[in-house]
């Protein structure tokens, strides 16, 4: 359900397009710049565009490197000249969700990132929950307040901010924990980022997807899990959708039932992807991921 404020602020054509997509359960394929990090900001986008990719996810790291010799306006022109739509940004700021001594500094850094990415035309921004600090049950009471503070900053820039649960996090590593915390915070500019790899390789179960309510997913990272001992899985071992053993069809159908109709952003870390030719990497991703999406009836 769209709010009155959203209706007034959103062009009718966009509202109609999204309504049709939600009703049909359709999603779009995107690629995260972490996947081609070795190529840099411009070359990653150029290669993907040549391969037919239309939706992209920007990283603060590659954008920062680009801005050492160019401008934010030029970064925007790279996107527009290639006909690319930026759907989300990795803000590159940690320490936002958990109680920690550097939280105030993290909020200041996050505000600067919001200004940067809002200027670039991004609608969404996210930060993972990764941390190795030790916590007690009492520490979880601070989470919702931290979320509200982050949400208020994002609101100033008309951004949706998302937390991505990380399988190795000592604070928020599972979907149920993140859902509970965001619901307690109840901030209108806050959503969850659902990562297929962190979900299936982490301490979650398929039934946890039933806990999601329509509208709670703000963005999705789309990968597969290799058929290796689970003890060997880490952040780098994720692979292209269709190459692994995760129940992607069932997971895609479930998030479609939850009315997600956004991008499925492929984020990979293996050197063969990050140091590979962005065009060839994107072409392989399309060849493998799009059939998976069609089989699940989300493309």
Which ranges hold each PLM region?
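Active-site acidic/histidine proton-transfer and metal-coordination neighborhood
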Residues: 11, 16, 25, 42-43, ...
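Short, solvent-exposed loop/turn segments at secondary-structure boundaries
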Residues: 67-70, 98-104, 136-141, 203-206, ...
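Glycine-rich, proline-tolerant flexible connector loops at the mouths of alpha/beta enzymes
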Residues: 58-76, 134
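Histidine-acidic metal/acid-base catalytic patches
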Residues: 2, 7-12, 22-28, 33, ...
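Residue-level detector of anion-binding/catalytic polar loops
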Residues: 54-55, 85, 123, 160, ...
């Amino acid at each position: 359900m769209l709010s009155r404020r959203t209706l007034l602020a959103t062009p009718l054509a966009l509202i109609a397009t999204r309504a049709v997509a939600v009703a049909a359960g359709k999603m779009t394929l995107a690629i995260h710049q972490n996947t081609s990090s070795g190529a840099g900001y411009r070359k990653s986008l150029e290669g993907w565009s040549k391969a037919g990719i239309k939706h992209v996810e920007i990283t603060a790291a590659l954008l920062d490197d680009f801005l050492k010799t160019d401008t934010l306006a030029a970064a925007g022109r790279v996107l527009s000249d290639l006909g690319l739509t930026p759907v989300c940004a990795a803000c590159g700021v940690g320490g936002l969700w958990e109680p920690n001594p550097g939280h105030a500094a993290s909020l200041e850094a996050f505000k600067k990132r919001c200004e940067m990415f809002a200027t670039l035309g991004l609608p969404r921004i996210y930060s993972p929950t990764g941390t190795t600090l030790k916590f007690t049950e009492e520490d979880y009471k601070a989470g919702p307040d931290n979320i509200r503070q982050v949400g208020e900053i994002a609101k100033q820039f008309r951004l949706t901010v998302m937390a991505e649960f990380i399988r190795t996090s000592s604070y928020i590593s599972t979907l149920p924990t993140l859902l509970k915390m965001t619901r307690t915070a109840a901030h209108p500019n806050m959503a969850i980022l659902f990562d297929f790899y962190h979900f299936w390789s982490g301490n979650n179960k398929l039934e946890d997807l039933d806990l999601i309510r329509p509208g709670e997913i703000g963005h999705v990272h789309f990968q597969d899990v290799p058929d290796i001992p689970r003890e060997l899985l880490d952040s780098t071992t994720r692979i292209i959708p269709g190459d692994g053993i995760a129940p992607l069809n069932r997971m895609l159908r479930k998030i479609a039932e939850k009315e997600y109709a956004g991008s499925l952003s492929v984020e990979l870390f293996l050197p063969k992807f990050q140091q590979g030719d962005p065009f060839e990497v994107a072409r392989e991703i399309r060849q493998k991921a799009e059939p998976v999406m069609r089989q699940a009836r989300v493309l």
